[in-house]
Amino acid sequence: DMVIKSDYIPKPGETIIGGNFYTFQGGKGANQAVAAAKLGGKVTFVCRVGDDYLGKNSIKKYETYDINTEYIGIEQNEHTGVALIMVDQRGENLISVSSGANSKLKIEDLSFLEKKLLNDDIVLTQLEIPIDVVKYLITICSKKNVKLILNPAPYQKLEDKYLEKVHTITPNITETKYLTEIDITDIDKSKLAAKKLLDKGIKNVIITMGSKGVFFMSEDEMAHIEAE
């Protein structure tokens, strides 16, 4: 991830002077893997990286968190996935992703799951990898009764027959609008959108709303957590 912080995000055609510039180990999948490892989880990370400094350095970094990297493939003649991120003073962001090696992940790379997945495992995935791989993951997790958490970003269309098998979904307000056709302008709209996703069969809905915090809904619970 390459991040520039500024007072506001520029409009199309506008150039502004930004603030601090940062580079981080990132990617939604990598962030999820590291967070789970920090919380004490036994984590296996499956992805593809490029045959470059960023990819090799990333693998070394994951291993410092005791993440199992045996299923990380190195893709020849491809760059490691990169995200360019602009963040304003409220924490709102604008992101463009160049998938690189991430786009080369194949269903065959996940064939080990047929034997390795256990009932008490949890699978986290997002949409920075090919959509057919995501559909395979959802299907195999449902078949083996394994909970799957989906971060539906960057948005790609998933048919309801796949969404109904998702245990937990974590869209932001933009992705929620794509999924439900409801524009999230307040908590009441968040409730309507979350209910629509629950009606599709998803068990838990967590809508991230930037500076407005996080909204959670399940069949029998609901909460709004303010941003700090």
Predicted features and spans:
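Glycine-rich phosphate/adenosyl-contacting loop at the front of the ribokinase-like
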Residues: 1-48, 53-67, 226
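Beta-strand->loop->alpha-helix junctions that form or flank phosphate-binding loops
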Residues: 20-22, 46-51, 69-80, 151-153, ...
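Anion (oxyanion) recognition and catalysis
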Residues: 37, 63, 142-143, 198
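Conserved phosphate-binding/catalytic loop of the ribokinase/pfkB sugar-kinase fold
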Residues: 48, 70-75, 85-122, 127
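Short beta-strand scaffold segments in enzyme catalytic cores
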Residues: 82-86, 94, 213-217
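Conserved beta-alpha-beta core of the PfkB/ribokinase-like small-molecule kinase fold
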Residues: 122-192, 212-214
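Conserved phosphate-binding/catalytic region of the ribokinase-like
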Residues: 157-160, 187-228
